[in-house]
């Protein structure tokens, strides 16, 4: 081996070491700058029916300490407006919102459940999800159970329309849940026709939605939620009974989707909290680092993680491009 070859090998080894050290420092370091101003619209915590890494109080305290602005508390089974009320009392300066997911545990597509939760003291119900684990799309891959339909023969059901009317009445956000892409398109199209102001398509790539379909949903005025899980390293995914056949994506593919749709139509979210996911602090840092490594700019990340969720939730957006 020549001296030139030896020097080249040593140089490459040192470069790999520096890159690894930089990544580890970014994920483990105490700096809160990367999470400053983030609003996570998809945060799982206890109390819940599934195992979680932390409870909502611990999550909110730690998120506030990291500089995060707020979060939507998500449970597939249990309404969380009451939980959000208590967290807002206990952790001032960090805004929490509740959700209602229209799975079988609340009677499926149940307008009365929506109205009751919307009237809970504090009015902290914000996102109303169409079915997730009880959606037809999920049941096709999981154990065979009764599913909760939102449409029939390409037409939204009357009770689905009634829920959408209540979303307008109480100034809520429509989230599409784990429904199949064709139903998500029906929902966003009808929401646009009805004048629903705030709509988010729940992690569409996990439902195998095409870029063309996402572009159409964006034209209907909906935000597209890009959760971290498809580009978090393998072996850190959640239960396959919740999201069947979870597709992984390379950061470069994710970046290409963002470019094709436009960052102004996308919301980055965590979907952390499950025991098989990373903790939300290093998880968010890994997510941001992966997108930046694929060419997404700081300004675009700020737009997708801070400004767009603030707009979805009816908050005054902070200044862009921090």
Regions found by a protein language model. Give the residues of each.
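Short acidic/histidine-rich active-site segments
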Residues: 227, 261-280
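Histidine/acidic residue-rich metal-binding segments in metalloenzymes
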Residues: 56-61, 81-86, 92, 111-127, ...
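N-terminal secretory signal peptides that target proteins for export/translocation
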Residues: 1-13
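Mid-to-C-terminal alpha-helical segments outside catalytic/metal-binding sites
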Residues: 281-322
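Bacterial N-terminal signal peptides
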Residues: 14-26
């Amino acid at each position: 081996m020549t001296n030139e070859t030896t020097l080249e090998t040593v140089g490459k080894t040192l470069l790999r070491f520096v890159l690894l050290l930089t990544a580890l420092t970014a994920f483990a370091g105490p700096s809160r700058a990367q999470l400053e101003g983030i609003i996570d619209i998809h945060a799982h915590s206890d109390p819940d029916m599934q195992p979680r890494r932390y409870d909502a109080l611990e999550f909110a305290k730690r998120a506030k300490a990291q500089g995060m602005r707020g979060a939507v508390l998500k449970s597939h089974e249990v309404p969380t407006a009451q939980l959000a009320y208590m967290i807002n009392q206990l952790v001032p300066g960090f805004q929490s919102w509740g959700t209602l997911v229209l799975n079988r545990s609340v009677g499926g597509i149940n307008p009365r459940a929506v109205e009751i939760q919307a009237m809970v003291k504090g009015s902290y119900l914000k996102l109303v999800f169409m079915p997730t684990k009880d959606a037809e799309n999920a049941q096709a891959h999981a154990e065979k159970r009764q599913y909760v339909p939102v449409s029939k023969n390409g037409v939204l059901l009357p009770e689905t329309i009634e829920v959408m009317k209540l979303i307008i009445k109480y100034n809520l956000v429509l989230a599409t849940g784990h429904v199949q892409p064709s139903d998500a398109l029906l929902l966003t199209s009808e929401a646009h026709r009805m004048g629903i102001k705030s709509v988010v398509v729940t992690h569409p790539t996990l439902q195998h939605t095409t870029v063309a379909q996402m572009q159409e949903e964006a034209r209907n005025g909906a935000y597209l939620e890009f959760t971290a899980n498809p580009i978090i390293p393998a072996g850190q995914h959640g239960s396959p009974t919740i999201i069947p056949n979870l597709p992984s994506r390379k950061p470069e593919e994710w970046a290409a989707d963002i470019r094709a749709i436009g960052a102004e139509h996308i919301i980055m979210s965590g979907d952390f909290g499950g025991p098989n996911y990373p903790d939300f602090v290093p998880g968010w840092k890994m997510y941001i680092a992966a997108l930046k490594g694929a060419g997404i700019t700081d300004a675009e990340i700020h737009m997708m993680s801070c400004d767009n969720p603030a707009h979805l939730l009816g908050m005054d957006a902070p200044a862009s491009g921090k």
